[in-house]
Amino acid sequence: NNIIKELTDESFELVDRPQCLERICQNIEHFIATSGVDRDKILGVGVSIVGRVNPETGRSYKYFTSWEEPLRDIISSRIGIRVMLENDTRARCFAEYTTGKSQKESNVIYLHMGRGVAIGIVIDGKLYYGKNGFAGEFGHIPFFDNEIICACGKKGCLETEVSGIAVEDKIVQL
């Protein structure tokens, strides 16, 4: 529960290219170098990424999917430190559970409404992944009777009306 340093790279755009992966690794290296912590004492690095993620295999199903190795293993081999990969909303949920206002609770639901819509779930002090590992990805549930095609390819998903992207689109149309 001791935050040593924070780093935000607001100019960063996550895309599925080698240059993007290199930037991620450079940001991690810069963070470690300027943290004031001896590199040998770092047990691991947590990386959260938007979209579907399998933390057990270390794979992202949205970014860097064409690479043979899991994203977690690629980053780990480049920086020389063990890496844990997690979905961004689940990571935020767990951070809220362990260090935020929900510390005294054993069950937490964290709603994230950004460019997409998702929830993170903690049950009995553990992140909940569901049967297929994607619990909380409810932004792509058909919810509206509209003809708006979602990023996932379906029509009428919750994200087509209430996500950050949907709100931006509505403002542009005004």
Residues covered by each model-derived region:
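Glycine/GP-enriched mid-protein hinge/lid loop-to-helix segment characteristic of carbohydrate kinases
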Residues: 6-10, 15-20, 78-89, 95-174
